[in-house]
């Protein structure tokens, strides 16, 4: 999956290290990120070639082996080589470990960007020098990176799995029922609620399968299998922007794997296809 970058090793522990010329520099602008000819993430040196960037204006984020990622809130102008493009380009980046490191870096850079002022008292915030945190110098509130949990559910009815298709975005592959966990819910509550809301089914024997960090929505996705309980007739939710366009039962034999295996969704669908024990027994 996307986060499986071995033999490279991901290091997310905080460090106060300073940037060097060949370190990677993440410059985010909303959901866009600065890229080199649309191909690679720029280095500190490449950005310094077009604008001034003092060492204290770059903040350490993470490392993959000896490749260090920093971000800055300096406004970097576009040039012939440097331009802003959708962060989603990193999902398919080659090599994959740079796509993963770049997107988690973008997630952190976005979090810093969204917390430039204290949400409680409006004072300009500061970066902690001891840990990955943002501190308000006036009221003392400390902000830590926030992760939004999501559940993805593979609903099974004997030898069939329920595949869905959403109307949102440009993503046209099949998917599984999914949604954010709401305040006050357990993961299992969220599974039952999302399934009922999206496809009008009751489920039982909810079982955890695996998880995936998903930087593009600052999420941690938890994948579950669940068996349909009672009538398997699908009633699609057709309200709202995230309405489902399709919800179909597909048998193991007819199931075609549409994805290279980057996403948890398709890893779970593959597990069903290959009769992984978690997909077949409750
Ligand atoms: Zn404050």
Question: What are these language model-derived features?
Answer:
Residues 1-96, 277-282:
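N-terminal alpha-helical interaction blocks
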Residues 22-24, 151, 222:
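Residue-level detector of short, conserved catalytic/binding motifs and their immediate flanks
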Residues 53-92, 181-282:
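Unchanged
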Residues 92-103, 107:
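Short, charged surface segments at domain edges that flank catalytic/cofactor-binding sites
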Residues 103-154:
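Cys/His-rich short segments
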Residues 114, 149, 157-158, 170, ...:
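A generic structural signal for well-ordered coil/turn residues at beta-strand boundaries
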């Amino acid at each position: 999956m996307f986060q499986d970058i071995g033999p490279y090793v991901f290091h997310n522990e905080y460090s106060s290290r300073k940037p060097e010329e060949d370190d990677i520099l993440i410059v985010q602008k909303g959901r866009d990120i600065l890229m080199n000819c649309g191909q690679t993430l720029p280095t500190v040196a490449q950005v310094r070639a077009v604008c001034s960037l003092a060492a204290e204006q770059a903040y350490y984020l993470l490392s993959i082996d000896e490749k260090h990622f920093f971000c800055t809130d300096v406004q970097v102008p576009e040039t012939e080589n440097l331009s802003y493009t959708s962060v989603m380009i990193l999902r398919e980046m080659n090599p994959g470990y740079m796509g993963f490191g770049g997107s988690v870096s973008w997630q952190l850079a976005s979090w810093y960007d969204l917390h430039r002022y204290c949400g409680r008292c409006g004072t300009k915030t500061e970066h902690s020098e001891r840990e990955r945190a943002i501190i308000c110098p006036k009221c003392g509130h400390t902000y830590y990176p926030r992760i939004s949990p999501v559940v993805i559910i593979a609903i099974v009815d004997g030898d069939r799995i329920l595949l869905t298709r959403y109307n949102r975005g440009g993503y046209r592959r099949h998917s599984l029922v999914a949604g954010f966990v709401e305040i006050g819910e357990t993961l299992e509550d969220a599974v039952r609620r999302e399934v009922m809301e999206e496809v009008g089914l009751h489920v039982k024997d909810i079982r955890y399968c695996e998880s995936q960090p998903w930087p593009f929505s600052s999420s941690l996705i938890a994948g579950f299998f669940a068996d349909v309980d009672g009538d398997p007739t699908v009633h699609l939710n057709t309200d709202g922007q995230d309405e489902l366009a399709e919800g179909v039962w597909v048998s193991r034999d007819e199931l075609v794997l549409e994805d290279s295996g980057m996403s948890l969704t398709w890893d779970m669908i593959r597990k069903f296809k290959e009769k992984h024990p978690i997909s077949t027994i409750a």
